[in-house]
From Swiss-Prot:
<dbReference type="Pfam" id="PF00361">
    <property type="entry name" value="Proton_antipo_M"/>
</dbReference>
<feature type="transmembrane region" description="Helical">
    <location>
        <begin position="389"/>
        <end position="409"/>
    </location>
</feature>
<feature type="transmembrane region" description="Helical">
    <location>
        <begin position="221"/>
        <end position="241"/>
    </location>
</feature>
<comment type="subunit">
    <text>NDH-1 can be composed of about 15 different subunits; different subcomplexes with different compositions have been identified which probably have different functions.</text>
</comment>
<keyword id="KW-1133">Transmembrane helix</keyword>
<keyword id="KW-0521">NADP</keyword>
<protein>
    <recommendedName>
        <fullName>NAD(P)H-quinone oxidoreductase subunit 2</fullName>
        <ecNumber>7.1.1.-</ecNumber>
    </recommendedName>
</protein>
<feature type="transmembrane region" description="Helical">
    <location>
        <begin position="424"/>
        <end position="444"/>
    </location>
</feature>
<feature type="transmembrane region" description="Helical">
    <location>
        <begin position="29"/>
        <end position="49"/>
    </location>
</feature>
<dbReference type="GO" id="GO:0048038">
    <property type="term" value="F:quinone binding"/>
</dbReference>
<keyword id="KW-0874">Quinone</keyword>
<feature type="transmembrane region" description="Helical">
    <location>
        <begin position="477"/>
        <end position="497"/>
    </location>
</feature>
<comment type="similarity">
    <text>Belongs to the complex I subunit 2 family.</text>
</comment>
<dbReference type="InterPro" id="IPR010096">
    <property type="entry name" value="NADH-Q_OxRdtase_suN/2"/>
</dbReference>
<keyword id="KW-0520">NAD</keyword>
<feature type="transmembrane region" description="Helical">
    <location>
        <begin position="291"/>
        <end position="311"/>
    </location>
</feature>
<dbReference type="GO" id="GO:0008137">
    <property type="term" value="F:NADH dehydrogenase (ubiquinone) activity"/>
</dbReference>
Length: 523
């Protein structure tokens, strides 16, 4: 099969030079990213006018930019497929779905950031610009179909993430988190480059499509080695065991709004990359990479949820929880069926709201108390019923308790796994889900202790809520929105699953993989 970009140029050979350039670039495919880029530039320009001006104008600029990106993504849904930038980017439904998850995660992360930034003395303009840069890299990564565009997008996301992790310069934990993230991330980038060089040497091209065709006829040990290198990079981005060591320290030391974005936006980009490169390139090694992913999924679900039991920090507990959640999502990838891929997309959308809702509650609590310890939440319902209710619902959803949105997300994943005879993954998933429910409910039980004397000292001295302070209203909007979707979304899970199914059905890359699985099943 010829390369997409070359095929497009061949069919348009008689076009005028200007028209040919427009057709080969097809810049309309990246208009959502263009909106984010313009918002980032405008944010930097406004920041030059001073902190007071930035505090007033940066939030609406970010809202307009991200809102425009989401509208443009909606317009791209089911649009005719045309490769852009000579086949280096493809805005199929899969890319649109994951880019929408990332843009929404950034929007919600910004809503819960303003009060935190004001309280900690963080420059709003710089922070928002770096977060938008990370968003830009993550969104481009979802549609990248070329090794060069993948690496550029990956590094844009990574470098911005390093800066965000260490943005609290006066906090030693933040600097430590940034350094650890930088060192491990740089190693992962080097490993990916080495794997990419092997793929280029085997195929003579950087196009994923051409590489996939070349590997069909060249299942050499070098190709298998490149698979290991690429898989290691993907596992690092999604924080899968044993490439998870950076996650607890980075989550604990980084600013909480940054952790909220990394837990969803960066993870969504990682899974989009996994689908694009593993399914698109390594079809000839389908059994091998699925076996490796099965091992990673079992390890991630087990270690993530078991180690979370012993945590005393709320952010560190959610860090290990996110490792376990990555293992659940990997079940859909291992299945390789339409239901599996759709359940994977659905669960990422559900994880967006329930995880960011939990982080909104944690930020609201830490702003008032300065504490991150789980024990300090004891008796919180007496002083702050809103946080108690919101955090309880989000944690129950993360644990998979019906009728929350997270329950239906897990059920779809487990059904897809069982239908594809992935019994080990489903059984491990069910057992570790029960383990996760234990530590989630332990937090809830602590918050709703009945006797006033059992409340923590932090809660006893809990300050009154002042919603008139700068950044509090956006935080409340994000909190209520996330909790509302998490609680009510379970009832609306069928339309959400239809949306996820449509994302898979209209993506040729996934349909080819599904057909391959079907042929092997018949064989």
């Amino acid at each position: 099969m010829p390369e997409m970009g070359a095929l497009l140029l061949a069919t348009q050979a008689m076009a005028a030079p200007g028209e040919l350039l427009n057709l080969s670039l097809n810049a309309s495919a990246v208009l959502p990213e263009g909106a984010v880029l313009l918002a980032m530039i405008a944010t930097l320009l406004v920041d030059l006018a001073g902190e007071k001006v930035a505090a007033r104008w940066v939030p609406p600029i970010c809202y307009i930019g991200l809102g425009s990106a989401l509208v443009l993504l909606a317009l791209q849904w089911n649009a005719p497929l045309e490769p852009s930038f000579l086949g280096a980017f493809l805005a199929d439904n899969l890319a649109v779905a994951f880019r929408a998850v990332i843009a929404t995660s950034t929007l919600l992360s910004l809503l819960i950031s303003w009060r935190y930034a004001e309280k900690s003395g963080t420059p709003v303009g710089e922070y928002a610009a770096i977060l938008l840069a990370a968003t830009l890299g993550a969104m481009l990564l979802c549609g990248a179909t070329d090794l060069v565009s993948i690496f550029i997008s990956l590094e844009t996301l990574s470098v911005a993430s390093y800066l965000l992790s260490g943005y609290m310069k006066r906090d030693a934990r933040s600097s430590e988190a940034a350094l650890k993230y930088l060192l491990v991330g740089s190693a992962a980038a080097a490993v990916f480059l080495y794997g990419a060089s092997l793929l280029y040497g085997l195929s003579g091209s950087t196009s994923l499509e051409v590489i996939g065709v070349a590997l069909q006829t060249s299942t050499t040990p070098i190709a298998a080695l490149s698979l290991v290198f690429v898989l290691a990079t993907v596992a690092f981005k999604i924080a899968a065991v044993p490439f998870h060591q950076w996650t607890p320290d980075v989550y604990e030391g980084s600013p909480t709004p940054v952790v909220a974005f990394l837990s969803v936006g960066s993870k969504a980009a990682g899974f989009a990359l996994a689908l694009r490169i593993l399914v698109g390139c390594f079809g000839a090694f389908d059994d091998q990479w699925k076996l490796l992913f099965t091992v990673l999924a079992v390890l991630s679900m087990t270690l993530g949820n078991v180690v979370a039991l012993a945590q005393t920090s709320m952010k560190r507990m959610l860090a290990y929880s996110s490792i376990g959640q990555a293992g659940f999502v990997m079940i859909g990838m291992v299945c390789g069926t339409e239901d599996g891929f759709a359940a994977m997309v659905l669960y990422m959308a559900a994880y967006l709201f329930m995880n960011l809702g939990a982080f909104a509650c944690i930020i609201l609590f830490s702003i008032r108390t300065g504490s991150d310890r789980i024990s300090d939440y004891a008796g919180l319902y007496q002083k702050d019923p809103l946080i108690t209710l919101g955090l309880s619902l989000c944690l129950l959803s993360l644990g998979g308790i019906p009728p929350m949105l997270g329950f239906f997300g897990k059920i779809y994943l487990f059904f897809a796994g069982w239908a594809n005879h992935e019994y080990l993954l489903v059984v491990v998933g069910l057992i570790t889900s029960v383990i996760s429910i234990y530590y989630y409910i332990s937090v809830i039980k602590m918050m709703v202790v009945k006797e006033p004397h059992e409340a923590s000292d932090v809660v006893k001295n809990y300050p009154d809520v002042d919603w008139s302070l700068m950044g509090m209203q956006p935080l409340r909007v994000a909190l209520i929105g996330c909790v509302g979707v998490t609680a009510i979304g379970g009832i609306l899970s069928n339309p959400l699953f239809q949306w996820a199914n449509e994302a898979v059905a209209e993506t040729p890359l996934l349909q080819q993989a599904i057909a391959l699985v079907g042929e092997r099943g018949l064989g």
